[in-house]
Amino acid sequence: MKNDFYQEDELLNSCLTNRGFLLSKIDEVISWARANSLWPMTFGLACCAVEMMQAAASRYDMDRFGMLFRPSPRQSDLMIVAGTLTNKMAPALRKVYDQMTEPKWVLSMGSCANGGGYYHFSYSVVRGCDRIVPVDVYVPGCPPTAEALIYGLMQLQKKIKRTTGFKYDSR
């Protein structure tokens, strides 16, 4: 009985695809669309922001991945934290994160954003932005190259494609 169901399903798939129809699951389509249309919001705090600008320029062209930088957190679904996060800036980071639309992702770029970096033992530095907001992808380096940032974004796209449909972690 189970094999009959799969044989009928394969027969239906082959008949419809030969006629120009595309069969897919809605969960796969939604996760594909989310992964290929990320709208990052920059939160550039130090020199890593320069590398982020370079990655968005014409040589690397992040637009080809469907990424469009947005100035407002209400229009973006990805926050790229680039640079040293101080104790004074931490509440602003959390406020901006809370204003982002669901589902939302965070990419931590550079040693300072990942763990405090060179200023790790300073009294005024947060030792990693993951203490303030949940981070999905870490990009190491001081500062990380534009290629490293693009690789991190591609890893985030893979992570998003593994999620299913309407389910997301509201954190």
Curated annotation (Swiss-Prot):
Chief place where the protein resides: membrane
Which UniProt keyword terms apply here? Answer: 4Fe-4S, Cell inner membrane, Cell membrane, Iron, Iron-sulfur, Membrane, Metal-binding, NAD, Quinone, Translocase, Transport, Ubiquinone
Q: Which cysteines are joined by disulfide bonds?
A: none
Q: Which PROSITE patterns match?
A: COMPLEX1_20K
List of residues binding [4Fe-4S] cluster: 47-48, 112, 142
Q: Which GO terms describe its biological process?
A: aerobic respiration; electron transport coupled proton transport
* Database matches in InterPro entries: NADH_UbQ_OxRdtase-like_20kDa, NADH_UQ_OxRdtase_20Kd_su
Q: Which reaction does it catalyse?
A: a quinone + NADH + 5 H(+)(in) = a quinol + NAD(+) + 4 H(+)(out)
Give the superkingdom in one word: Bacteria
Its needed co-factors are: [4Fe-4S] cluster
> What is its membrane topology?
Peripheral membrane protein
Subunit comment: NDH-1 is composed of 14 different subunits. Subunits NuoB, C, D, E, F, and G constitute the peripheral sector of the complex.
Stated name of the protein: NADH-quinone oxidoreductase subunit B
The gene it comes from is nuoB
